[in-house]
A protein has these predicted regions:
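Alpha-helical structural elements
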Residues: 15-17, 62, 76, 90
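A short, structured beta-strand/loop element
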Residues: 31-74
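Short, charged/polar N-terminal "headpieces" of proteins
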Residues: 1-43
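Alpha-helical membrane insertion/targeting regions
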Residues: 2-11, 19-20, 52-54, 58-62, ...
Length: 107
């Protein structure tokens, strides 16, 4: 951020941009997550390779389940990913505080 830019009062920037692998689905979609921010939010990012578009992507923020930046996925795919995230959110939230799955599992 340079001197001419200001950060809005209500935005808390994460301390790190580190993303941790969480799960690869049977359709080759990769789910990764960030560390938990000071505001308690965790960024969950889904990405899937596509021959035409390069990658399809979507971002979900926990614990609010706010979705944004959805590109290339069908409604059916997004509904499936929503179910996956909702059913595993407790694990993602835990791992986000422990440096990802590998660190939480002492691997």
């Amino acid at each position: 951020m340079n001197a001419s830019q200001t950060k809005p009062e209500n935005v808390i920037l994460p301390s790190s941009n580190m993303m941790y692998p969480f799960m690869t689905l049977d359709d080759n979609a990769e789910i990764v997550h960030s560390e938990m921010g000071k505001d308690g939010r965790v960024k969950v990012y889904i990405e899937k390779p596509d021959a035409k578009d390069g990658f399809h992507r979507a971002t979900c923020y926990l614990p609010s389940y706010t979705w944004e930046d959805i590109f290339g996925f069908s409604d059916e795919e997004i509904n499936r990913y929503k179910k996956v995230i909702e059913s595993t959110a407790h694990l993602i939230m835990e791992f986000s505080q422990k440096g990802g799955f590998n660190n939480a599992a002492n691997l």
